[in-house]
Amino acid sequence: MGSIEKLSSQLYIIDDYDFQRAQRTGTYVLLGDDITLIETCASPSVPHILNGLKELNIALDAIRNIIVTHVHLDHAGGAGFLMTNCPNATLFVHSRGARHMIDPTKLIQGAKAVYGESFDKLYNPILPIPAERVCIVGEGDTLEIAANRTLTFYDTPGHAKHHISIYDSLTNGIFTGDTVGIYYRELTKYGVELYLPSTSPTQFQPDAMLESKERIKSLNVDCIYFGHYGASTNVSEVYRQLEFWLPVFLETGKEIFKTEEDLVTANNKLANSLFEIVQSHLTQQGIPTTHSLYEYMLKLEMDVNAKGIIHYLTQLKVGPV
């Protein structure tokens, strides 16, 4: 099972084996005068990144830039650990996320509260990054990594307030993190394309997500590079599915939230409903109900999505009176 995939002559993706599963989360390697990595996943994935860089014959001291789209732990939890191995690298991050990379105390506390005894296996260690090695980027900022390759940063909230997307001039592609959803690429071998919104708590904002999608759409890119997982050139289908699934998720959540006062019960009901809706959609397209994707990823992700939607609706106070 290969851990590296060549996407273009100057772009690779390393499989981070997030949750010990292939094609879950990836780290992108952009070649140029200043070698650049986008996304770090969590610290248990850093050895996979280091092995991938070694396989690509990239010296760790040659890496100049490490970019995270946002500071959720499956995208940036390993940044501190990775940077201890890359002495010449600078971390690029949204202004709202920078302080958590410099002092990850709140990230650690939050993760331990959610994951308990599983924290060490999933995320440990989360290491601080010296402030002088952190560079804040925002809307319209650019980073030239080669004479023919400039990265442009865009503020793309919706999944998180501190989310950036990165346009790559060389490939006319954009690294979107979780802004326009998750790509279940392993289903393509069945002839199925599935892109689902990621509505995780606590900063999910559907209107902002759709506005960010429109911002990305306006760039007329040829390719979208997902945090989860890999590249899609069928960009119009990405946008279409986000526009389809996001209202489905929200309306399902609203119906449950209006009648269920207990938030834990509402979360569970919504997670089950979302799972059943997506599973039904996939079985109609020939994906067997025994496929490992259902048990290992979809159930987990629909639970996280449900929590984000219920939290959003709670903030709106659209619940029972």
Residue locations for each model-derived region?
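Metallo-beta-lactamase
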Residues: 42-44, 62-74, 101-157, 161-233
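Residue-level marker for buried hydrophobic side chains located in beta-strands
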Residues: 36, 67, 91, 173-175, ...
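C-terminal regulatory/interaction regions
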Residues: 251, 255-321
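Conserved beta-strand hairpin/beta-sheet module of binuclear metal-dependent hydrolase folds
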Residues: 2-56, 166-178, 182
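Active-site/pore-lining binding-face segments in mid-to-C-terminal subdomains
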Residues: 207, 212-273
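Metal-dependent catalytic neighborhoods of phosphoester/phosphodiester hydrolases
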Residues: 77-86, 104
